[in-house]
């Protein structure tokens, strides 16, 4: 075990704070409509240009191990907010840095960190309740477009495209974003389906950055039973390898030797393969496999139908243009199934819904019907260069996540106004002692941080903007950094999803409170570089 370096108390928190500030300074410049871009060097290919906070945060790794701990903790805030709400990562980072900065000062002044933490928790939960109470449900397609446009940094065409996509496949429908082969960005609705099962092993992942499996033009094998051994599968696996196409295996389960063999083949590059469990249970599983078979023009391999695995041919496998598999979901896009077969399946389900008397069965049939009939909306992102396409794709994915969050929990005034106005929930709030009250005040001050940063990125003094807005009684009044005017944010279409604002504050408060209560830091002592090797004696002058 290597020797460790230990830092205590104020020294430990000072190192943490330096790391937090370095990460915050890199991320905060992207906030708001006039936020700047960040250029990230890549090991191969052109540098990446992005305005996405979580992408910037994920790239940061500091040389000093103690400072790096602080940076990684706040990076966790950005990642967690992104996972839960899909947007608001920069806001979460700015809030976390503000709460920790103020908290570290008060701990250094002799206040009790545990009491401060209690105050922060009280303040955050009061603000969350206030945000939820003020949230307004999203009703129209126009409001959905507004949310999308704001999340895409003021790009109205992106907002409109997302609103159209939601109109076509429904608010709960499947919408995917992929790179186009042309310069235009377009929306297309294709036959497809999503179900709640993810990859059986992370070794199947093909896109490590997004931790997902992306299969282009794959064969799809649908098997009703568990797979424990691959012996029976070998003939069809060899046939798929000959085609050079990937293979998706959907079965009740893939266990032990079979899973290990597939993983080894994938890692060695012999066979592009991924395996997922079939959705549903019992008879419902069989029905869903038949739905997928209709969608992909494949055949379900079932011994009830007299088909054995060893006799399967390529013609029995389904096909699709693209399959995306994440940790918990699988999306099949543009299956090659015939429209007539899919329609027949849909009609059969509608008839079953009419006939069934069980509410539970009816609900499950309606779920299956929605999955099969809804299709998948695909937004194909175009651009002049690969760098532009990647940057635009980041923004559209952010906007899509924000719109889903808005539909889920409603909207609040954007541009940092919702947090600033929610300060009223903490006015006069007192803790059980002075230190708890100081913790509440930390949150009170932090609520101004996002709007200050948006103003500063637009070239204004943040405190002047905050001062002017605080003096106005209208809760929707805010500063539009794009036009540099004071407007009614909701009327101007500058809105944020309540879920994004709430999640950003909760995650920031949680991590910052943990950092404030840190008293000791432990890290490996960096290894000293060994002295350079000395040349053999007596060989100094060899006549060169």
Curated annotation (Swiss-Prot):
- Cross-referenced CDD domains, in alphabetical order? GroEL
Q: Which GO terms describe its biological process?
A: protein refolding
Nucleotide-binding in keyword set: yes
The membrane-spanning stretches of this chain are none
Read off the PROSITE patterns from this record.
CHAPERONINS_CPN60
Does the keyword field hold Isomerase?
yes
**What residues does ATP bind to?**
30-33, 51, 87-91, 415, 496
Q: Which SUPFAM superfamilies match?
A: GroEL apical domain-like, GroEL equatorial domain-like, GroEL-intermediate domain like
Q: How does it assemble?
A: Forms a cylinder of 14 subunits composed of two heptameric rings stacked back-to-back. Interacts with the co-chaperonin GroES.
Function, as annotated: Together with its co-chaperonin GroES, plays an essential role in assisting protein folding. The GroEL-GroES system forms a nano-cage that allows encapsulation of the non-native substrate proteins and provides a physical environment optimized to promote and accelerate protein folding.
Name assigned to this protein: Chaperonin GroEL 3
Q: Which gene encodes it?
A: groEL3
């Amino acid at each position: 075990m290597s020797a460790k370096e230990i830092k205590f108390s104020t020294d430990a928190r000072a190192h943490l704070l330096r790391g937090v500030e370095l990460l915050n300074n890199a991320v905060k410049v992207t906030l708001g409509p006039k936020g700047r871009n960040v250029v990230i060097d890549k090991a191969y290919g052109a540098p990446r240009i992005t305005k996405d906070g979580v992408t910037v945060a994920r790239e940061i790794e500091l040389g000093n191990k103690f400072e790096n701990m602080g940076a990684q903790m706040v990076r966790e805030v950005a990642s967690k907010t992104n996972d839960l709400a899909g947007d608001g990562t920069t806001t979460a980072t700015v809030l976390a840095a503000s709460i920790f900065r103020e908290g570290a000062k008060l701990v250094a002044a002799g206040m009790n960190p545990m009491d401060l933490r209690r105050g922060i928790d009280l303040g955050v939960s009061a603000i969350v309740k206030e945000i939820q109470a003020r949230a307004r449900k999203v009703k129209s397609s126009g409001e959905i477009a507004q949310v999308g446009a704001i999340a895409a940094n003021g790009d109205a065409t992106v907002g409109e495209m997302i609103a159209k996509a939601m109109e076509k496949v429904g608010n709960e429908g499947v919408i995917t974003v992929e790179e186009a082969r042309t310069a235009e960005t377009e929306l297309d609705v294709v036959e497809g389906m999503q179900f709640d099962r993810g990859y059986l092993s992370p070794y199947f992942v093909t896109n490590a950055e997004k931790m997902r499996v992306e299969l282009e033009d794959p064969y799809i094998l649908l098997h009703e039973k568990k797979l424990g051994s691959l012996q029976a599968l070998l003939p069809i696996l060899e046939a798929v390898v000959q085609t050079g196409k990937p293979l998706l295996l959907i079965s009740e389960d893939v266990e032990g030797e079979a899973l290990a063999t597939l993983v080894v083949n994938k890692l060695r590059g012999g066979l592009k393969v991924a395996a997922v469990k079939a959705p549903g249970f019992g008879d419902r599983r069989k029905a869903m496999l038949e739905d997928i078979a209709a969608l992909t023009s494949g055949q379900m391999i079932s011994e009830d139908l007299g088909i054995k695995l060893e006799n399967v041919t390529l013609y029995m496998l389904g096909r699709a243009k693209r399959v995306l598999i994440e940790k918990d979901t699988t999306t099949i896009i543009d299956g090659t199934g015939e429209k007539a077969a899919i329609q027949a399946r849909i009609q059969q389900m509608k008839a079953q819904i009419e006939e069934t008397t069980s509410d539970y069965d009816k609900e499950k049939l309606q779920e299956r019907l929605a999955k099969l009939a809804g299709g998948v909306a695909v937004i194909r992102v175009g651009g002049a260069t690969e760098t532009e396409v990647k940057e635009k794709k980041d923004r559209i994915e952010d906007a899509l996540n924000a719109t889903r969050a808005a539909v889920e929990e409603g909207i609040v005034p954007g541009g940092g106004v919702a947090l600033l106005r929610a300060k009223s929930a903490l006015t006069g709030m007192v803790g059980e002692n002075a230190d708890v009250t100081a913790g509440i005040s930390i949150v009170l001050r932090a609520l101004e941080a996002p709007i200050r940063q948006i103003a500063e990125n637009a070239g204004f003094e943040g405190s002047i903007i905050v001062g002017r807005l605080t003096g106005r009684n209208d809760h929707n009044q805010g500063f539009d950094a794009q036009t540099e005017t004071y407007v009614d944010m909701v009327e101007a279409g500058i809105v944020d999803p309540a879920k994004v604002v709430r999640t950003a504050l909760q995650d920031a408060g949680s991590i910052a409170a943990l950092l404030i209560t840190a008293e000791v830091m432990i890290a490996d002592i960096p290894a000293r570089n060994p002295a350079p090797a000395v040349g053999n004696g007596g060989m100094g002058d060899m006549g060169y």
